[in-house]
Amino acid sequence: MSEQQQQGAEQALDLNNEMQARREKLAALRKEGIAFPNDFRRDTTSDKLHSLYDGKSKEELEALNVEVSVAGRMMTRRIMGKASFVTLQDMGGRIQLYVARDDLKDDVYSEQFKKWDLGDIIGARGTLFRTQTGELSIHCHSIHLLTKALRPLPDKFHGLSDQETRYRQRYLDLIANESSRETFRTRSKILAAIRNFMVNKGFMEVETPMMQVIPGGASARPFITHHNALDIDMYLRIAPELYLKRLVVGGFERVFEINRNFRNEGVSPRHNPEFTMMELYMAYADYKDLIVLTEELFRTISQDVLGSSVVQYGDQTFDFGKPFIKMSMKEAICHYRPDIASADLDDMDKACKIAESLGIKIEKSWGLGRVQCEIFDETAESQLIQPTFITEYPAEVSPLARRNDDNPFITDRFEFFIGGREIGNGFSELNDAEDQAERFQDQVKAKDAGDDEAMFYDEDYVTALEHGLPPTAGLGVGIDRMMMLFTNSHTIRDVILFPAMRPQK
């Protein structure tokens, strides 16, 4: 047995012994009929106490004589004979408890409290005071065991240094790591701020189907399921776009949805097969209006949630108080690869040679627009560190976007990038039903040629367009990638509570 295996065996034995001792304590509680009480009520949380009383002196607290009831997990305990100090952790943070034998009834201190374990859920009532070292604390006059923890806190044995354990057992990560708790508190605040921003702009929040007969709205491989009662295959949605635009046809001229999308694709630091998107659609607007709205959205969220328009991400600094950089796709390619001539990108043979020199494998179904897009992905995308709008996407890779009036090869579309990754996508919507039908046919041909990410033909959506879609602009924002930026997280798993993981054997 190696030294590492020996250490692992010893840790497992220690854990088993610890759990056995805790189970015996629980058995005693069951025998007394007080194993899992549910009659304790708290009236405040640690963060509220710190907010209200951190500025109060010892004398002021004594004069106020504030009685409180708190509950949470016992994280640390220092027993000093007839008195102990406990660190209690709740959703808002931590507060210190002072527990003295003479302040409790019926020998609770010796017979109960001293036998409790770290990780147990407890409730306490007492008076606020400040210790000799100046720490805000609660002088307890009653304390109760609410839930017996059978497993020890994660850091007692092997800790949570293993990233996979943090993702698989997020509850342990949240118990042990304040940084993780803060990340998800920030995520919640950002979602609330986004909704507030959208409502203030006159948008109505809606919900559209998560299971669809025809998946649409994006080029991606869908998950397939089966509806037993209807006896039909259905798809988990890859995007809500076509349903949201049906609502615009119906007269809801400003709509948005924040919800999950599902794409049967790989997992990476940037990709999770189940992810959160916000999509919005606004009638009587174009992609240029979306650019202004996007800049305002990021500026507002940054200012309202983080308190500044300047965001630090790794060693990069983003100032959302400034306009984003703007350039076309071809301009970006030539900017980051000056050796590539813009004119060559408009020639299929020359563009294919450029792509092949970059290691791009050309598929038979690709046209010039797809080749250009692949060249952009290879040469420019990772270089777009500062907030940047890339415009003039080819129609071939934009089957739902309106063609440009001056150049029908391209569309009135942008994607925006921050930190070298795509964050969102917006365009003036295609509202020509006949053009949309033709583009769906092109997608069907691409699918027949082997492109399993090509779109399906959605006949009902074409019918909806035939009833008249007002001039409309639509935007999609990757919420998880947005969260990565605003929480300085460098993998998408750090901002998704329960990311996709391969099952353990």
From Swiss-Prot:
This is Lysine--tRNA ligase. Homodimer. The keyword Ligase applies. Transmembrane segments: none annotated. Its cofactor is Mg(2+). Binds 3 Mg(2+) ions per subunit. It is found in: Cytoplasm. GO terms for molecular function: ATP binding; lysine-tRNA ligase activity; magnesium ion binding; tRNA binding. Belongs to the class-II aminoacyl-tRNA synthetase family. NCBIfam families: lysS_bact, PRK00484.1. One of its GO terms (biological process) is lysyl-tRNA aminoacylation. Gene3D superfamilies: Bira Bifunctional Protein, Domain 2, Nucleic acid-binding proteins. GO terms for cellular component: cytosol. PANTHER family: LYSINE--TRNA LIGASE, CHLOROPLASTIC_MITOCHONDRIAL, LYSYL-TRNA SYNTHETASE. Its EC number is 6.1.1.6. Signal peptide: none annotated. The lineage of its organism: Bacteria, Pseudomonadati, Pseudomonadota, Gammaproteobacteria, Enterobacterales. Mg(2+) 1 binds at E415, E422. It catalyses: tRNA(Lys) + L-lysine + ATP = L-lysyl-tRNA(Lys) + AMP + diphosphate. Coiled coil: none annotated. It holds the Pfam family tRNA-synt_2.
